Amino acid sequence: MQNNNDILKAQSPAALAEEYIVKSIWQDVFPAGSNLPSERDLADKIGVTRTTLREVLQRLARDGWLTIQHGKPTKVNNIWDAAGPNIIETLIALDMQSAPLIIDNMLSLRSKMSESYIYEAVKNSPQKSTALFAELEQLQNTAQDYTEFDYQLFRQFTVVANKPFYRLIFNSLKGVYQRIGLLFFKEKTHRELTKQFYLEMQQICLEGNADAVVDCIRKHNLRSSTYWKAILERLPQNLSD
């Protein structure tokens, strides 16, 4: 776990404390399994109040970075065992070298999940599935609009399919989903390719042809895979800013 950028960028005291602790954990200054320094020592070192530090520690504990032990020192967790997908955006900020792999994993997960729950959605309620494309004709040809439409479309299919767990996964990935979506959809060719996918999927929903869902998704993923490969090979260093 390494990061060449040791300069803290946070502005507020709480953000500064969080960035310092998270970077220190990632760089093994505070290794997994070790204990953090006392609140007093850590607050003095960072330059924040103990109240601010305590709030930050509680938030990091909820995210899986730490385990707060009442009456005992706060323990540093192994994030790969204790954290959830909501920290992905933080991991990308900490280690841009690992970002392509993490994002590729996320895209693969989305593809596999969507094959399952979109099939269920179209099978159980083709009318509600079709309604998700109501705004497609008015979709503006911009990266921002395509990114938002894409996120909402895939997320709302989880609602129609009655898959609340998948919906929570989308919620936790929203930040990084939007960042990489803007990278993908800034190219007109990518928007045109995706628009064709939307139209094909809309027709499938209109016909209630659930059996065609998986093939449609896989064909789109295959068509777009070359574009994604190029994007992941030249990710901007300021992706997390």
Swiss-Prot record:
Keywords noted in UniProt: Activator, Cytoplasm, DNA-binding, Fatty acid metabolism, Lipid metabolism, Repressor, Transcription, Transcription regulation
A GO term, aspect molecular function: DNA binding
Occurrences of domain HTH gntR-type (ranges): 11-79
Xref: NCBIfam families: fadR_gamma (TIGR02812), PRK04984.1 (NF003444)
Quaternary context: Homodimer.
Task performed by this protein: Multifunctional regulator of fatty acid metabolism.
Protein name: Fatty acid metabolism regulator protein
Taxonomy of the source species: Bacteria, Pseudomonadati, Pseudomonadota, Gammaproteobacteria, Pasteurellales
